[in-house]
């Protein structure tokens, strides 16, 4: 196998550029491309704080499965391994080459120099290769942190450009206060994943898929203090949808 390692939140264009290199190098070497990722975000394990995420674990795994052979690790189980110990584990699992992202580091010894990883690789029997960064002239600097900043600033267009797809949240439709219906605007409130990052409060133009059809949707993110609901809500008014969608799984896309 030829492998790469990371959390890959959002599976954005920079990640997919890395995976493209992984597949090309694998084809040239006759090796199966493999992606090693973690079940938990490292900050959740190391700092006890779960950061807002661009993709839930299931969303992330689903996106990664199409990019290479997927291996999901528990970060809590490997957090104390040094880079050498971790590479020994990879070698035992059949990894012959390791492609490292241009800004990626791993191991409890917190090595920062690529030459150290290359040296350990030689000692372990793994060829360590540096990946190229996605050229900035294509879409500018791309990172999960930059996408989070764009979303938090309400710049969904920039976030989508860096992601390479439209940002979305999904969840089951739950009973709201039905106030929208009383003023002629029936809405669907979804019970979205708590770890999912939302843009700032406001009304956004988007789309929603219902029963194999896409509908233009006004998505309202915010609180509803007029009815005593202080939690953040995700509520969509789907233009042209008739009937009750309560209990259905919906996906709001921006």
Labelled PLM ranges:
Residues 81-186:
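Classical nucleotidyltransferase
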Residues 35-39, 67-78, 132:
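A conserved beta-strand->alpha-helix junction
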Residues 176-254:
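Phosphate/ribose-recognition catalytic cores of enzymes acting on nucleotide-derived substrates
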Residues 1-56:
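N-terminal catalytic cores of NTP/NDP-binding nucleotidyl/phosphoryl-transfer enzymes
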Residues 30-34, 69, 96, 127:
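Residues at the starts of beta-strands that form the adenosine-phosphate
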Residues 12, 64, 98, 159, ...:
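Residue-level signal for inorganic ion chemistry
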Residues 50-61, 78-87:
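Glycine-rich, highly charged phosphate/nucleotide-binding loops
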């Amino acid at each position: 196998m030829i492998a790469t390692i990371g959390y890959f939140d959002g599976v954005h264009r920079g990640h997919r550029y890395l995976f493209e290199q992984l597949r090309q190098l694998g084809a040239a070497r006759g090796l199966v491309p493999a992606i090693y990722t973690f079940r938990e975000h490292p900050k959740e394990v190391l700092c006890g704080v779960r950061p807002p995420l661009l993709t839930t674990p299931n969303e992330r795994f689903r996106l990664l499965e199409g990019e290479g052979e997927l291996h999901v690790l528990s970060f809590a189980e490997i957090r104390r391994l040094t880079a050498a110990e971790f590479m020994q584990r990879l070698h035992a699992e059949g990894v012959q080459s390791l492609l490292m992202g241009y800004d990626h580091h791993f191991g409890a010894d917190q090595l920062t120099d690529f030459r150290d990883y290359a040296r350990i690789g030689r000692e372990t029997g793994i060829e360590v290769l540096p990946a190229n960064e996605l050229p900035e002239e294509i879409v500018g600097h791309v990172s999960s942190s930059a996408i989070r900043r764009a979303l938090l600033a309400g710049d969904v267009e920039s976030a989508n450009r860096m992601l390479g797809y439209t940002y979305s949240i999904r969840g089951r439709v739950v009973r709201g206060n039905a106030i929208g219906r009383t003023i002629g605007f029936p809405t669907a409130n979804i019970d979205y994943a708590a770890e999912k990052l939302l843009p700032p409060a406001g009304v956004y133009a988007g789309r929603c898929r219902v029963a194999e059809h896409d509908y233009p949707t006004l998505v309202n993110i915010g609180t509803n203090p007029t009815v005593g609901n202080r939690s953040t809500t995700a509520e969509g008014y789907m233009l042209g949808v008739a009937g009750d969608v309560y209990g259905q799984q919906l996906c709001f896309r921006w």
